[in-house]
Amino acid sequence: MTQGSPRAAARARSGFARAVRAAGRTATALLVQAALAATAAHAAHAIAQYGEPKYPPGFKHFDYVNPDAPKGGTLVLANPNRLTSFDKFNPYTMRGNIAPGIDLLFESLATGSSDEPASAYGLLADDIAVAPDGLSVTFHLNPRARFSNGDPVTAADVKFSFDTLKSRQAAPQFAAYFADIARAVIVDPATVRFEFRRHNRELPLIAGGVPVFSRKWGLRADGTRIPFDQLAFEQPIGSGPYLIERYENGRNITYRRNPAYWGADLPVRVGTHNFERIVYKLYGDGVARLEAFKAGEYDVLVEYIARNWVRRDVGKRFDSGELVKREFRQHNGAGMQGFMLNLRRPQFRDVRVRQALDLAFDFEWLNRQLFYGGYTRLDSYFADTDLQATGTPGPGELKLLEPLRAQLDPAVFGPMVVQPNTNPPGSLRANLLKARALLAAAGWTYRDGALRNAKGEPFTFEILDDAGSAFEPVVIAYQRNLAKLGIDARFRTADFALLQKRLEAFDYDMTTIRLPGVQVPGPEQFARYGSKFADERGSDNVIGLKSPAVDALLAALGAAETREQLLDATHALDRVLMHGYYAIPQWYSTTHRVAYKRTLAYPQTLPLYYSAEGWVVSTWWAKPGN
């Protein structure tokens, strides 16, 4: 019930978050060399959005890997999300359920390091050149780069991949994410240039994160092509370190390390991908998954529910030391996990109503009774980072906010929103009294046994969740408080596939969604909060936000030339979003809870910005003799 909670998987439904992150988006991307128009661009092994990359030319490996890690063994994992089956290998289309681990087959021009926020190092590219005017970036491809079929990776493949991802055959999030990249231009067979619609310091990194696949993927023997959005179980042709060895009934899949993998000796790959095989077994629900782990059926359990960590992740194998439990600090930033309100529904359009719903949520009781004190309340869209707004707006924020004053709640110019608290001297009763006053001011009063508007219509809505969720006790507690206000909140569950479809169609009133944290906000913020995405089916603008003021702050964020300007824009955005009460913020943890077999080992130096599953797959290894 933390950051990786149920809806984290749902928001990755189209493959956008998973695929772009797999392509190097987390640390973002990198770029190549080549001459531009007037002045020659400077070629480099890596780039950073601000300042210089941490690792210099000629570096041997990242600090958080073990360059001497032994190779071999099999890593067995369970469902990394709520999906209990898969029906495709293509992670770049909207429909269907993606096979877990499929990102192991693909690479991008560049990849980020996990111990710095916004840099990118050559992967498929061996150098990168950003134009002096910042309006393009050129990548030169490593001549050794090969796809799994043995073909060299060419500029034509890069352009084909980019053009496909921006087309209607790919999930719409890609077109949104790459919107400011106007085109990919083939300079020569080994060189590709990306041209931008405007200057933005992150765009070279974003271009470097474009996933690359072969033009032959989906090509039939007779030369005709299977439409990209119809590719399902056709073997992907990527350049990544693993191949699909076998799969069964959409429930199990085994990856084998490619013995001819071209990039094993690259500095960005040394000490990584140490397992000979990686197996995913998909279980029907969380109970079956946990019991299978305790029975020794798979090797690593990443626990997202604090109560389970204390009460259920126990037993004789833990007592004997065969299974080990550890918490690992991470600095990813909490992002926003909360009960998201769908502004497309009329009952949620008044900010006073939304604030009242926030006042009815008793986090402190939940943390004591259900979570064993394992969480911290979210109070920002950028919590646990320097991107979070605090106090009153500073001079840089005011410079952005003042021109928007007429469009904003005056409260935005005062102290930052403080989440309601029920610890003494606060109380749930006091919060509900405030909520009742806000609802009355918005035209909702209690009569005839329910909260009603001027037309006599009762205040009702549905809280949507997936059938395998552990959120029911949380929802029941929230329902109880809402009922005291006269609000009828119904709890509805759906299987994961149906849930995905409903989210894509914005067919929900309220649902728990997690928007992952970032260290350097970029296009994902436009996709989440930009007005033009509010009506685009399958977009990440889950709340349906249409705000010219927010659009203006997003534009300022995109135009930031320095880290200071980025902070001012993000603080202002955070302040406006929080004062809008578009979500009832839930909670976060600053650690990854990981239980694992003692036959596994990991580097002693931890990365800073990482997912637990990705870290295990990419840098752990099997102890020799096991």
Where are these regions (language model features)?
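N-terminal lobe/hinge region of extracytoplasmic solute-binding protein
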Residues: 43-133, 163, 170, 237-241
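Extracellular/periplasmic solute-recognition and catalytic clefts
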Residues: 183-186, 245-256, 281-345, 352-356, ...
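Gly/Pro-rich hinge or "lid" segments in bacterial periplasmic/extracellular proteins
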Residues: 100-116, 208-277, 284-288, 295, ...
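Surface-exposed binding/hinge segments that line
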Residues: 140, 175-222, 241-248, 392-405
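Ligand-site clamp/hinge motif
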Residues: 142, 230, 261-313, 355, ...
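Aromatic-rich, solvent-exposed beta-strand/loop patch
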Residues: 122-126, 148, 153, 195-215, ...
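Detector for C-terminal structural segments
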Residues: 46, 79-81, 96-97, 101, ...
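Aromatic- and charge-enriched surface segment that lines or borders ligand/interaction sites
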Residues: 65-70, 92-99, 127-171, 187, ...
